[in-house]
C-alpha cells in the first residue's frame, strides 16, 4: 500500500489523549492573534462535537485561507494548514490541555478536520476551539456520556431530521439552543441533494440564499431541479447548509449523534440506486456532470461521492472511510451504538446503504395511483393495495428461501428445514401451515430480499437490542415504523405505505 492509498484508507481521522495541567501563561504579548505577520485563517462552518462517550469525543472543523471563499472547494494544490486544538474544562480556557494538539488540514479533504479526543472524564462538560496562525474558531462545548455503570436519573436530548434548506422551519434551531441538553440526535436528511424540486415549494427564508450546484446537474424530466452528482456538489451542500448561523450555534453548544437517510445521496434511494425516474430512462451514456441514470442502473461513483462528503462533514465515531476498491459503494459503515450509563442505550442504524430494492418495483403501474400527474413519484413505492403488497413481499421472501436452500450442501441440517418450508409453500403460499419454528426460519432467511438493514446489520441490531440491559433502548431509525393507511373511495382496498414491512416490524417488536 503506497502513501496515497494509506491516506485514503485512514480517512484523515486522527486520535490523541487529553492530558490536563498547567497551560502556561496567557499573556496577550504571546498571543499569536496579535502577531501581524501571521495569516488570520477562518473557520466558516464553525465547530462540531459528536458521539459523546464516557472517555472520548469526536471534534470537527474546517479551515480556509483568509482570502478564500467560504464555500468553494479548497484548491487541490493548496499546502496543508497546521491547526491547533485547545480543550479546557472552563469556557475561559484557564484550565486547558498542557499542550495544544497539533492537527493538519488537507486540501484533499477540503480542509476539514476530524479528531478523536480520548482520556476524558465521564459526565463532564468541556470547551474547545481551533487555531490556525492568527485565526481562532468560535468556542464549542460538549458533555461526555456518564460511565457505563453509572446510575443516571435523567437524560436530556432532542432529535431532529429533514432540514430542507428551502423550508421555513430553521427558526426552531434558535429555540433549541436555549435548552439544557446533553446532546442532539439527527435522524437523517441533514442535506437535500435536490434544489428547486416540486416538493420544495415553501418560501425560502430571507437568510438563505439560492443553492447553485457546482456541476449544474439537473434532475431527469425536470430541468428546473438541480441535483448533487459530484463530490464537489455534496461538499457544497454541507457547507451551504452549515453557513446558517443558527445551525452553527446548535452544533457549538451540543454534541451531535447523526445518521443519514436518503437525501444525503438521492431521494428514496437504496444502496447505490436512485429512484427519480421509476425506471423509465437511462442516461448512463452521457458524460459527467449529468443527470443520473434510472434506478435500474447502479450509480457507484455518485454514491461514493455522497459517502465521502458525509464522512468529511458529519463527525462520527466510526471506522475510517475506505475508498481502496474503486467499484465498492459501501465505503463507510455508519451504524453504531452509544450508551449513557444504565439509563439509555442508543442503537443507530443505516437503512439506505444495505437495504433491498423496494418491495414493489418502481416501474410497475399502480392501480391505487392512476393519476401520475397529481401523485408523481409517490407511485408504486408508497400507496399500494395491501393484498398486492403482501403477495409481492411473500414472493420475494419465498425466493430468498429457495436461494438459501439451493446454496446449502446436502449434509447441512438447515437444508432439511428449508426444504420442508418450500414444500409446504407450494400448496400454501401464505405460509399458514408453517409451524412456529418454521415460520421463525422463514422470517429470518426470507428477509434477505426485503430487508432495509441487510443481514449483517440486522443481526448486529438484534444482538444489541436483546443483550442491552439499559432501562431505555432507543433505536435511531430514519424510516417510520408506523403504517400509513387510507380508505380510498375509488378503491375498496386498503392501501399501505410501501416503506413498511409487516414481517420485519413484528420481529422488531419482539426484540424491544
Regions found by a protein language model. Name each.
Residues 3, 10, 18-19, 29-512:
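Metal-dependent phosphoester/phosphodiester hydrolase catalytic core
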Residues 23-24:
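C-terminal motif of bacterial Sec signal peptides marking the signal peptidase cleavage site
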